[in-house]
């Protein structure tokens, strides 16, 4: 359970991050990763953050239906749409304050200009069907298709903000990257003389940091490839090369081809009009998946089920131990 004065452990994570930097920054090269439990269900925030966000909500003239008096402190899984949205917004704000603490700590140690900072997310927003909001239809993860667990852009396109030495302030870069690029990037930036394993999927982003859109990423994989990432979603493989993204439904064999530069919403399927592009990208994707023994749809599904069974058994064993300890 989360401490009542520290919902989602946001406050202690902020403090621990700042304390680590004050203790270590400037003495030797360091790496720190802060992974919050927020934003994620259950929605939680402090009473102070809720009231602050509620005030802005009302001042903005937003829907106050269901804005009932709350007794929880902190606010936990509130009822009513307005309360849920306010709690979620307050939770995100409390999480984002980690950046303030991190930047302040780096500034105090004199290492702010000598440190790479990466702000990103592990997946896209939660998938939600179209809903009627304020008299209109809104897709809550729009304008992107689908969301978390999906290989459509709504599931894999995430915010990524990077600052550090050699990166031009206020610049925007459209070179596609993927999070498994970070390991070879950190290895490259650290100046390590040891080598990475030969078949690491990602590539260093050093040239992208320095040259922006003119930078290139050299990877072992011939593009950015995803292969059946979620066992309870339709089995799909995808590959992104340049502006184009090809998706193949592993059961039906259906192809979807999108030009992400002109159609990031993935609304216009170009597969029928560009058969040669489909063939070229599909052969590259299949060849790589075969090379790394990615498996068939059924093999991947069974591997996921086996893993879930393992997690389930761990939970059962844990509860049994707790019961035995209580007795």
What are these regions (language model features)?
Residues 1-180, 189-200, 248-251, 261-266, ...:
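Active-site-proximal cap/lid insertion segments
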Residues 20-22, 235-248, 256:
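Short, surface-exposed beta-strand/loop micro-motifs that present aromatic residues
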Residues 195, 217-218:
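Glycine/proline-rich active-site loop of Rossmann-fold NAD(P)-dependent oxidoreductases
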């Amino acid at each position: 359970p989360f401490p009542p004065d520290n919902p989602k452990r946001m406050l202690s994570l902020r403090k621990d991050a700042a304390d680590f930097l004050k203790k270590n920054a400037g003495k030797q090269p360091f790496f720190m990763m802060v992974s919050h439990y927020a934003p994620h269900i259950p929605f939680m925030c402090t009473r102070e953050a809720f009231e602050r966000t509620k005030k802005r909500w009302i001042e903005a003239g937003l829907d106050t239906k269901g804005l009932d008096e709350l007794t929880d402190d902190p606010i936990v899984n509130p009822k009513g749409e307005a309360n849920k949205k306010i709690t979620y917004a307050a939770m995100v704000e409390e999480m984002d304050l980690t950046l303030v603490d991190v930047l302040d700590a780096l500034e105090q140690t004199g290492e702010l200009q000598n440190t790479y900072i990466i702000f990103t997310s592990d997946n896209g927003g939660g998938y939600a069907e179209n809903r009627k909001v304020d008299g209109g239809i809104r897709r809550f993860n729009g304008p992107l298709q689908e969301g978390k667990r999906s290989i459509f852009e709504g599931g894999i396109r995430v915010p990524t903000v990077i600052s550090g030495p050699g990166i031009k302030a206020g610049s925007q870069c459209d070179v596609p990257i993927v999070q498994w690029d970070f390991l070879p990037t950190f290895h490259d930036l650290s100046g390590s003389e040891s080598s990475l394993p030969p078949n690491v999927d990602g590539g260093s982003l050093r040239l992208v940091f320095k040259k922006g859109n003119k930078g290139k990423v050299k990877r072992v994989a011939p593009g950015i490839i995803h292969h059946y990432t979620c066992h309870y979603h339709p089995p799909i493989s995808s590959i992104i090369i340049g502006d184009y993204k090809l998706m193949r439904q592993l059961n039906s064999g259906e192809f979807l081809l999108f030009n992400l530069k002109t159609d990031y919403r993935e609304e216009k399927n170009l597969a029928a009009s560009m058969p040669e592009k489909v063939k070229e990208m599909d052969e590259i994707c299949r060849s790589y998946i075969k090379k790394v023994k990615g498996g068939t749809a059924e093999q991947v599904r069974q591997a996921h089920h086996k893993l879930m069974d393992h997690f389930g058994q761990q939970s059962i064993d844990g509860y049994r131990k707790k019961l035995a300890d209580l007795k």
